[in-house]
Amino acid sequence: MASPAPPAAEELPGPAARRLYSRMEASCLELALEGERLCKAGDFKAGVAFFEAAVQVGTEDLKTLSAIYSQLGNAYFYLKEYARALQFHKHDLLLARTIGDRMGEAKASGNLGNTLKVLGRFDEAIVCCQRHLDIAQEQGDKVGEARALYNIGNVYHAKGKQLSWNAAQDPGHLPPDVRETLHRASEFYERNLSLVKELGDRAAQGRAYGNLGNTHYLLGNFTEATTFHKERLAIAKEFGDKAAERRAYSNLGNAHIFLGRFDVAAEHYKKTLQLSRQIRDQAVEAQACYSLGNTYTLLQDYERAAEYHLRHLVIAQELADRVGEGRACWSLGNAYVSMGSPAQALTFAKKHLQISQEIGDRNGELTARMNIAHLQLALGRLTSPAAAEKPDLAGYEAQGARPKRTQRLSAETWDLLRLPLDREQNGETHHTGDWRGPSRDSLPLPMRSRKYQEGPDAIERRPREGSHSPLDSADVRVQVPRTGIPRAPSSDEECFFDLLSKFQSSRMDDQRCPLEEGQAGAAEATAAPTLEERAAQPSVTASPQTEEFFDLIASSQSRRLDDQRASVGSLPGLRITLNNVGHLRGDGDPQEPGDEFFNMLIKYQSSRIDDQRCPPPDVLPRGPTMPDEDFFSLIQRVQAKRMDEQRVDLAGSPDQEASGLPDPRQQCPPGAS
């Protein structure tokens, strides 16, 4: 909050007071300049300290204060303190609008858009970035226009990428809304590229080429993606930008993987590995090793795959990346099985189990347990195949975990496994003791793998009484115990809506606000009746005092609107004097807001509804040594076609020989896109 405004310097008698104010102004400016110098040197923490000190001293120069707000917001952004960055960029926007600084308003809107994008508030970010674009075009600022186009493209790209991660789909296999979002990103990047070519800005052209390549990669246009990434690579080499060059090689490798050119992809990943060592970035070095390990798995060179996965494991341990360490152990287990070394594979499977338990990865834990049981059976350490067919699932049903991929213990691979959530919620009785493998055509749709989802007319089979058929080779079905919700004689829908209405009716009373009538018995008169009392009451009729009721609502809402208004006098570091009070009062626009303002307001308010939605279940954290583009689902499909070639011929019983290999499709890796 701003401190009480002292009198202006010219209002105080004597030159001493004027010298004091001059020193205060000089002190504020000097502190801000030192903060700017430190931020340019990369010391953002120290820079923030000087900027905050400048705000504490305060200034009556509105332009200086606006610049301090902008610099503070940027410094907090680089420190990843996005809430504080958002706060100061809002201060900057408010002050710029108040003094009528259109260019300052454009820059503040752009900074707000970038911060909102990082916070995942994409719709609000688009509104702010569009405001930046509109003002830049209005002022004829070509550089600002290009920057605004690039920022809008970034917001659409980030939104599309997040949606594709949530959908857990491969590049090119995306829902229509995600594709539309990415097409919008591509349009703005194309406009940005055209403008920066006109301006002759080669560095900006490189950024546009790189982002166009990334967008086309997500859309599944892999040939176009390689074209753009080659342009990005050429410009990075032109500027000697090793970090950008490394990213271009990595992106080229990802695109060539999906084009089926695994050997070309391996060469690009090797270049990535060399550059990551040159710039001394261990995290990206580990990512390159991981990508090379997966590439050599696709090339069926399992010894080299294991070599690179071991390098990944060592770096992940050095960086304390437990997610990456677990993924490396899982990959090493599969590689050693493919090389015919189940004993070494068992060691890594046990390590994978331990790490999955530590980080709370339920899917990984189930996968590791099944791998261990399978490998122990193959090594002859289990006396009964039933022990491998029934791994320890205790605690999974109670905690509601739904493993996505599991392993089959027959001659083929396990298919996608999901628990029927609707039955779990409706409380039907299931027993975990009898495992049954119905054919794929008889499974309900949520329990089929993506590979078999094209069958539209599947019907669920119920377990037969007294049946003890062996494990079918098609699928495995995990069944859950009865939940605590009793079944009503009515249908599922009636039961659900009955429970919902009872629950919601009790919540309504909690949201009522008492009316201040000033009478002693008002509290008793407005007390909410209990559930039983409401059930006995007749239906409520309309009140005759309708006008008074709406007047009450209007007065209440008007007070709430006043509470939400931004006050210029509350800006930190602002000293209001006679010199600047005219700017604060006179530069506002007296005319009524136009359609553009109301359209922007509607978009903003509609995005606020999403903030009140329940968040989806948390996904696994992404370790620093794990690349964003994992392409592991491609390995799953390729490996599924080569299962016969990868089987290990172990001496032992027929059961051991038929047990097969741990399926590399058991678990979707964190970060798969």
From Swiss-Prot:
Modified residues (Omega-N-methylarginine): R418
Region (Mediates association with membranes): 1-507
Record SMART domains: GoLoco (SM00390), TPR (SM00028)
TM stretches of this protein: none
Residues the record lists as Phosphoserine modifications: S410, S442, S467, S469, S490, S491, S543, S567, S653
Annotated Gene Ontology cellular component terms: cell cortex; cytosol; endoplasmic reticulum membrane; Golgi membrane; plasma membrane; protein-containing complex
Each TPR repeat, start to end: 28-61, 66-99, 106-139, 146-178, 180-199, 206-239, 246-279, 286-319, 326-359
Domain (GoLoco): residue spans on this chain: 493-515, 546-568, 594-616, 628-650
Compositionally biased intervals (Basic and acidic residues): 420-439, 451-467
Record PROSITE patterns: GOLOCO, TPR, TPR_REGION
Biased composition (Low complexity): 516-530
Topology in the lipid bilayer: Peripheral membrane protein
PTM entry text: Phosphorylation regulates interaction with G(i/o) alpha.
Any one GO biological process: nervous system development
Coiled coil: none
Induction comment from the UniProt entry of this chain: Up-regulated in prefrontal cortex and core region of nucleus accumbens during late withdrawal from chronic cocaine administration.
Record has tRNA processing as a keyword: no
Record localization: Endoplasmic reticulum membrane; Golgi apparatus membrane; Cell membrane; Cytoplasm, Cytosol
Domain remarks: The GoLoco domains mediate interaction with G(i/o) alpha. The GoLoco domains are essential for the GDI activity toward G(i/o) alpha.
Family listed: Belongs to the GPSM family.
Further comment found in the protein's record: Responsible for altered neurotransmission and altered behavior like drug seeking associated with cocaine addiction. Depletion in prefrontal cortex reverses the behavioral consequences of cocaine addiction while overexpression in drug-naive animals induces addictive behavior upon acute cocaine injection.
PANTHER family assigned to the protein according to its UniProt record, in alphabetical order: G-PROTEIN-SIGNALING MODULATOR 1, LD33695P
Protein name: G-protein-signaling modulator 1
Name of the gene this protein is made from: Gpsm1
